[in-house]
From Swiss-Prot:
Alphabetized Gene3D superfamilies for the sequence: Peptidase C15, pyroglutamyl peptidase I-like
Lineage: Bacteria, Pseudomonadati, Pseudomonadota, Gammaproteobacteria, Enterobacterales
UniProt similarity note: Belongs to the peptidase C15 family.
Complexes and interactors: Homotetramer.
Cellular location(s): Cytoplasm
BP-aspect Gene Ontology terms: proteolysis
Record organism: Erwinia tasmaniensis (strain DSM 17950 / CFBP 7177 / CIP 109463 / NCPPB 4357 / Et1/99)
Protein keywords: Cytoplasm, Hydrolase, Protease, Thiol protease
GO CC list: cytosol
EC number: 3.4.19.3
The protein, known as: Pyrrolidone-carboxylate peptidase
Amino acid sequence: MKKVLITAFEPFDGERINPSWEAVSRLHNRLIGGAEIVAKRLPCAFGTSLEVLYATIDAVKPDLVIAVGQAGGRADMSIERVAINVDDARIPDNAGAQPIDEPVLSGGPAALFSTLPIKALVAGIREAGIPASVSQTAGTFVCNHVMYGLLHYLRRRKARGGFIHIPYLPEQAINHPGAPSMALATVILALEMAVSISLAVEEDMRLAGGATH
């Protein structure tokens, strides 16, 4: 049976919860698309997030890895296209580290691209009535750090991988006036679809998903 590893993060930046873990934890031990789901919470810390991720990949030996993170202020399921080889933290991580203009991987490529069928994910999630789009930036905080590290680690492995950013949950958005949110049940459904589509689609669709700015 195939295995799918889905990761999420602990709360950070003063939040009581992280919507990524609230959603991903509910998928643990589920069967989706004929595959067993393994959920893992990562520390929101540059120094240890990849250590935990790599150890989990080695233990689980997944066929597919989807990392999920919070993007407060975004309104939809943001399917990330690319990770860049830069850590530039606007705020300290949960361990107090705040790297500025440092590489994720010294000597590594400037960027690494998701190996998920990102256009098919957007199309499928939208078809279910859930807002989704291709995102051209995963930021320069721990989410981008994990996405870059993940894609680098999978280069010599058969597994596919990528990153999805999700909005605040409503209970978070009330503390951020004007910020969009998405219900937990909707996020969970979208992630279920992301797993199913990623397992089923080998060659991505050719659909416009770029940005003008």
